[in-house]
């Protein structure tokens, strides 16, 4: 099981955060990361993961969606992917998760890149936030320092 953490715990870990995309653009330096395909984007995000080992988080809303929205998402998944989705448990409606294993990252990048369910990725060590996905264009936000 993967247990969620609160927004306060995410911030305490040192992550950047914004409630909306326009807020992120106003608060932080930004760039757009583009990829030709899902595999290329995964390679880039895995690099960020390795440079922030132990300090990577993501939001994942599946556990708090209504039953109909959960069913639509499950319809996109095969058996192993469904088990991955079900591993994420939301405590008290919290949707932030520490990504302690690479399979968690890979699963969330895949779901985001395929437009099934979007996640934002938070990197505490290098202070970056990657917002996905707009036709394989991911806005990335960095601390202004």
Spell out what each predicted region is:
Residues 1-137, 141-145:
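Structured alpha/beta or helical-core interaction and ligand-binding surfaces enriched in interleaved
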């Amino acid at each position: 099981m993967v247990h969620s953490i609160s927004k306060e715990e995410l911030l305490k870990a040192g992550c950047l955060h914004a409630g909306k995309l326009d807020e992120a653009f106003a608060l932080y330096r930004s760039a757009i990361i583009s990829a030709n395909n899902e595999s290329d984007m995964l390679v880039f995000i895995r690099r960020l993961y390795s440079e922030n080992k132990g300090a990577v988080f993501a939001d994942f809303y599946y556990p708090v969606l209504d039953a109909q929205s959960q069913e639509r998402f499950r319809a996109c998944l095969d058996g192993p992917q469904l088990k991955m989705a079900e591993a994420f448990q939301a405590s008290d409606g919290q949707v932030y998760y520490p990504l302690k294993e690479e399979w968690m990252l890979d699963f969330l990048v895949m779901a985001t890149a395929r437009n099934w369910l979007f996640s934002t990725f938070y990197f505490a060590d290098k202070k970056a936030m990657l917002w996905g996905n707009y036709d394989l264009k991911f806005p990335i936000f960095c601390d202004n320092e």
